[in-house]
């Protein structure tokens, strides 16, 4: 009996252990194989850039170059160690708006993440705005320094670069109107907008867009100003697209209402106003935040519709000169827009280049497959051309602010600003898309952060004037009193004058630019003569003209850079040759100018458009 009892107990114990073991094995890690991909690494964007350092070395005096290079190198380390993470978090923790508190009180509380606030603090600490206005530094140097720093910052900035653009534009506007030291609010605003102290620094908004339209400022403005006393007014209107609504001050346009309740229409009726967004108690200044915009990209950035119902503002500048007053702002923000475009282009190339050394496909890394490196090389060539165009704009802006511009340089600044903005914006979207393709399916995955670059880049051809709007602005530049076409030719010839013609590739590059320039000049002169007879519509080819100017100018800059043996290397020569000789610098034909072609365009576009008869088209 004793043996039988032991046997029963052993059998029972064995059964229990089996049950425990069976239950235990229900829990184990999934077997997914040992392979995982290695993502791209963001290196110091200053040290990692193939052309930025050489460009600055050429443009700046040696002592200034050393100072600027040290600052940018240090900032590049901060971008990789801190800024990039903050910008990513701003995308993941997007702003939201609470209209009412729990008790039904209207509060219009804008909630942004801590990372957004930290990024704004970093902008002040790093002097992102103040660098452009430091009295102790030559304006020529400081603008180049500022643009370089913004270029490094922009793709990691979590769209804080947008309020920085508007802040820079506001400082430029207020100082250009000679208000500093003469106007209390303007003086305080300038000091705070360019402050390096995060506890004192302000940011500015610009509220120009209304329901009737964006770029048509004169026709679209439906905001009215009722005078309280000499220069103080109450504003009433609806601002349709207002970015960075957590700003401290804003510049806006409005129509002054006279004593009879009438307001002048058109651009002559617009005046410029400066207002604080909140009063001393922190309450909104006669402003209601109606809603945050649901945008394709730039989701980190709080963009709102605003109802102005008695917002107290101060008129700055002469009455009826509002459009002229914002011209300086637009020049600055358009350069910032180009910085953003090129920042996205450079970032996607840098990440794709790094990834190509890690991703193994068909037995070797992407970097060893000729087709892949050819793709990246084409992207690099186009980016370098526009990068030099950007720093040409920075150089010209600095010379203008220093009062050192020649007549040709002054005209080139007016021409290059819209050309740079529209061309870089038009390049950015397809290039970032191409770069995302370099990552295969991973480029399409939201949690890699790569799609954010594409969505955010899409705004750059739209903000501060679409491609078509700015192309028409380029035509207005040519229709002015100055002979811009002649000045453009002189600048290109000046750049080509240093060409190392003993180098066959540079010689051919120079010939290609000269040929394209002559063709453009011939076509524009011919079109101007025929336009009197109504045979041509030069406006229909405005974007082709603008693109051609961008390519010719960029090509000449690349040749000039590659001919400087003190900084250039063999890749600079190859880039200049590929840019100028392996792709068309001019994409323009005489038959495209014909008035009859416009009629044919309409027939193509509205073929079988059933709503045509009911529309006003």
Swiss-Prot record:
Residues 11-22 have a biased composition (Low complexity). Induction: By heat. Two-fold induction at 25 degrees Celsius compared with 15 degrees Celsius. Residues 23-41 have a biased composition (Polar residues). InterPro entries: ACDH-11_C (IPR053998), Acyl-CoA_dehydrogenase-like (IPR052904), Acyl-CoA_Oxase/DH_mid-dom (IPR006091), AcylCo_DH-like_C (IPR036250), AcylCo_DH/oxidase_C (IPR009075), AcylCoA_DH/oxidase_NM_dom_sf (IPR009100), AidB (IPR034184), AidB_N (IPR041504). Changing residue 443 to R: In n5877; suppresses the defects in egg-laying and response to reoxygenation of paqr-2 mutants. FAD binds at residues 206-215, 241-243, 359, 366-369, 437, 441, 464-466. One of its GO terms (biological process) is fatty acid metabolic process. One of its GO terms (molecular function) is fatty acid binding. Substrate binds at residues 215, 267, 334. Disruption phenotype: Temperature-sensitive mutants in which embryos develop to adulthood at 15 and 20 degrees Celsius, but have a poor survival incidence at 25 degrees Celsius. Mutants have increased membrane fluidity and abnormal compositions of fatty acid species. It is an enzyme of class 1 (oxidoreductase). Its EC number is 1.3.99.-. Belongs to the acyl-CoA dehydrogenase family. PANTHER family: ACD11 DEHYDROGENASE, ACYL-COA DEHYDROGENASE. Homotetramer; dimer of dimers. This is Acyl-CoA dehydrogenase family member 11. It comes from Caenorhabditis elegans.
């Amino acid at each position: 009996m004793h043996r039988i009892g032991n046997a029963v107990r052993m059998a029972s114990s064995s059964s229990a252990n089996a049950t425990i073991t069976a239950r235990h094995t229900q829990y184990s890690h999934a077997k997914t194989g040992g392979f995982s991909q290695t993502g791209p690494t963001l290196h110091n964007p200053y040290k990692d850039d193939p052309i930025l350092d050489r460009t600055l070395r050429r443009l700046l005096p040696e002592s200034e170059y050393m100072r600027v290079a040290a600052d940018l190198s240090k900032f590049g380390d901060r971008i990789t160690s801190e800024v990039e993470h903050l910008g990513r978090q701003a995308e993941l923790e997007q702003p939201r708006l609470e209209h009412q508190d729990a008790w039904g009180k209207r509060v219009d509380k804008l909630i942004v993440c801590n990372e957004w606030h930290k990024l704004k603090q970093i902008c002040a600490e790093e002097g992102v705005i103040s660098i452009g206005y430091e009295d102790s530094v030559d304006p020529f140097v400081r603008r180049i320094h500022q643009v370089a720093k913004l270029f490094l910052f922009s793709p990691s900035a979590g769209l804080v670069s947008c309020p920085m653009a508007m802040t820079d534009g506001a400082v430029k506007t207020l100082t250009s109107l000679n208000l500093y030291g003469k106007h209390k609010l303007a003086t305080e605003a300038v000091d705070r907008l360019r402050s390096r102290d995060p506890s004192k620094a302000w940011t500015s908004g610009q509220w120009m867009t209304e329901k009737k339209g964006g770029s048509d400022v004169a026709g679209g403005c439906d905001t009215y100003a009722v005078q309280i006393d000499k220069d103080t007014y109450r504003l009433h209107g609806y601002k349709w697209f207002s970015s960075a609504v957590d700003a401290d001050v804003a510049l806006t346009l409005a129509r002054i209402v006279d004593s009879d309740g009438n307001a002048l229409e058109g651009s002559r009726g617009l005046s410029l106003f400066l207002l604080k967004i909140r009063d001393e108690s922190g309450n909104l200044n006669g402003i209601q935040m109606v809603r945050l915009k649901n945008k394709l990209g730039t989701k980190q950035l709080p963009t709102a519709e605003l109802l102005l119902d008695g917002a107290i503002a101060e008129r700055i500048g002469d009455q009826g000169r509002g459009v002229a007053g914002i011209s300086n702002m637009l020049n600055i923000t358009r350069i910032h827009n180009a910085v953003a475009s090129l920042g996205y282009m450079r970032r996607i190339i840098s990440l794709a280049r790094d990834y190509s050394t890690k991703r193994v496909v068909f037995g070797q890394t992407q970097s060893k497959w000729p087709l892949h490196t050819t793709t990246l090389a084409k992207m690099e060539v186009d980016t370098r051309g526009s990068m030099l165009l950007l720093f040409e704009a920075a150089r010209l802006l600095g010379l203008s602010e220093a009062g050192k511009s020649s007549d040709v340089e002054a005209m080139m600044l007016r021409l290059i600003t819209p050309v740079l903005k529209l061309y870089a914006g038009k390049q950015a979207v397809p290039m970032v898309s191409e770069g995302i393709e370099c990552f295969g399916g991973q480029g399409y995955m939201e949690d890699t952060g790569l799609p954010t670059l594409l969505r955010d880049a899409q705004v750059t051809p739209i903000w501060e004037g679409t491609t078509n709007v700015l192309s028409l602005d380029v035509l207005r530049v040519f229709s002015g009193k100055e002979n811009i076409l002649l000045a453009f030719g002189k600048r290109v010839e000046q750049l080509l004058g240093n060409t190392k013609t003993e180098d066959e590739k540079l010689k051919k590059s120079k010939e290609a630019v000269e040929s394209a320039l002559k063709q453009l000049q011939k076509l524009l002169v011919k079109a101007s003569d025929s336009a009197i007879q109504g045979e041509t519509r030069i406006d229909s080819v405005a974007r082709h003209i603008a693109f051609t100017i961008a390519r010719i100018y960029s090509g000449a800059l690349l040749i000039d850079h590659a001919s400087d043996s003190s900084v250039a290397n063999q890749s600079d020569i190859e880039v200049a040759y590929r840019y100028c000789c392996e792709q068309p610098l001019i994409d323009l034909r005489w038959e495209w100018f014909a008035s009859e072609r416009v009629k044919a365009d309409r027939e193509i576009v509205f073929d079988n458009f059933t709503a045509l008869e009911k529309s006003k088209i």
